[in-house]
C-alpha cells in the first residue's frame, strides 16, 4: 500500500522533476539566467505557450484532440494586428466570432459523432486561410494596450513567472475545485454516467471548446503583444507544443485525466528547453528534437511507474 502511494506521488511529481532536470543544466551553464532579467528573457514566450496549452487541455479533457490551435493562435494575432488596430469594434467582433465558432465545432463533433482529429485538421486549414487573407505577408502592428500589458514588469519576480503561476492557480481552482469543473471533466471521464444524470454532453463539449477558444484568443493576443507584429504562420508549432505540454504534465488522451498545474509546468519546461538551445546557438530543428526527447523520457518513466503500480 505504501509503495503504491509512493509510486502515485512520484508519477504526479514527474512534471516538476522534468522542469528541474531542464533548469539545473541551464543554471550551471548560465548562472545569470536566475536573475530577474535572465529569467524574464528565458521565459519571454512562456505565457502564450501556457495559454495555448490550456486551450489544448480543455479539448483533451473530453478525450478529443485539437490540431488547429496553432493556426488559430496565428489567426488571432493577425486579427489583432489588423482589425483590432484599424477598427477595434470589428476586431472584437471577429474574436468573439472565433470563440463562438470553436464552441459550435464542439457541439457539432458531439452531435454527429465525428472524430475531432478530422474536424480540427480541416479547421486548421480554414484558420490558416483566413489569416493569409487578413495578412498575406508578415506585418501589422500590436494595439498599444496589448503591448503595454505584455511589457508590464512585476516587482521582484519576472512577469512571465508571475502570470504563469496565476494562470495555473486560477485554472486549477476552476477546473478541479468547482462543481462545474467536475461536471465538465465528467464528460470525458464517464460520459455514460453523465447522460444518466441528465447532463447534456453536447453542452459540456461546446463549453469546453468555447473555453479552448477563449484561451486561444488570449494566447494569440499575448503573442502579438510580445512580437509587436503578426504573421499567418506565427504560431503553427503551438499545435504540437501544446499537445506535448499537456501529456508532459500528466494528461492522458482518455478518461478526462488532466492536470492544469502539470500542463503549465510542461509548457514552461518545453519553453526553457527551446530557450536554452537558442542560447547555445543550436538550430531550431534540434530544438524540436530536444523537446521530443524530453517527452519520450517522461512518458517512458510514467509507463514504468504504472507497471510498478499493477505489480
Q: Can you describe what each PLM-predicted range is?
A:
Residues 21-86, 109-112, 245-260, 293:
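Single transmembrane alpha-helix segments in multi-pass membrane proteins
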Residues 216, 226-292:
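Transmembrane alpha-helical segments in multi-pass inner-membrane proteins
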Residues 112, 116-177, 204-207, 226-235, ...:
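Transmembrane helix-bundle core of multi-pass membrane transporters
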Amino acid at each position: 500500500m505504501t509503495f503504491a502511494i509512493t509510486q502515485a506521488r512520484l508519477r504526479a511529481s514527474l512534471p516538476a522533476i522534468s522542469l528541474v532536470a531542464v533548469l539545473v543544466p541551464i543554471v550551471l551553464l548560465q548562472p545569470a539566467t536566475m536573475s530577474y532579467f535572465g529569467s524574464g528573457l528565458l521565459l519571454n514566450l512562456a505565457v502564450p505557450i501556457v495559454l495555448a496549452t490550456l486551450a489544448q487541455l480543455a479539448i483533451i479533457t473530453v478525450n478529443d484532440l485539437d490540431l488547429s490551435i496553432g493556426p488559430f493562435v496565428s489567426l488571432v494575432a493577425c486579427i489583432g494586428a489588423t482589425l483590432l488596430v484599424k477598427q477595434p469594434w470589428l476586431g472584437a467582433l471577429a474574436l468573439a466570432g472565433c470563440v463562438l465558432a470553436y464552441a459550435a465545432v464542439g457541439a457539432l463533433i458531439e452531435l454527429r459523432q465525428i472524430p475531432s482529429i478530422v474536424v480540427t485538421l480541416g479547421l486548421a486549414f480554414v484558420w490558416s486561410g483566413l489569416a493569409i487573407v487578413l495578412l498575406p505577408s508578415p506585418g501589422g502592428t500590436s494595439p498599444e494596450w496589448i503591448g503595454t500589458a505584455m511589457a508590464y514588469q512585476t516587482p521582484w519576480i519576472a512577469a512571465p513567472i508571475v502570470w504563469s503561476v496565476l494562470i495555473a492557480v486560477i485554472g486549477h481552482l476552476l477546473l478541479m475545485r468547482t462543481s462545474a469543473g467536475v461536471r465538465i471533466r465528467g464528460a470525458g471521464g464517464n460520459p455514460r454516467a453523465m447522460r444518466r444524470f441528465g447532463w447534456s454532453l453536447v453542452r459540456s463539449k461546446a463549453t469546453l471548446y468555447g473555453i479552448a477558444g477563449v484561451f486561444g484568443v488570449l494566447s494569440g493576443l499575448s503573442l502579438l503583444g510580445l512580437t509587436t507584429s503578426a504573421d499567418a504562420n506565427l504560431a503553427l508549432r503551438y499545435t504540437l507544443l501544446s499537445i506535448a505540454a499537456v501529456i508532459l504534465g500528466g494528461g492522458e488522451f482518455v478518461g478526462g485525466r488532466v492536470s492544469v498545474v502539470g500542463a503549465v509546468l510542461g509548457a514552461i519546461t518545453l519553453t526553457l528547453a527551446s530557450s536554452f538551445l537558442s542560447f547555445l546557438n543550436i538550430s531550431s530543428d534540434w530544438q524540436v528534437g530536444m523537446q521530443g526527447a524530453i517527452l519520450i523520457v517522461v512518458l517512458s518513466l510514467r509507463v514504468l511507474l504504472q507497471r510498478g503500480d499493477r505489480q
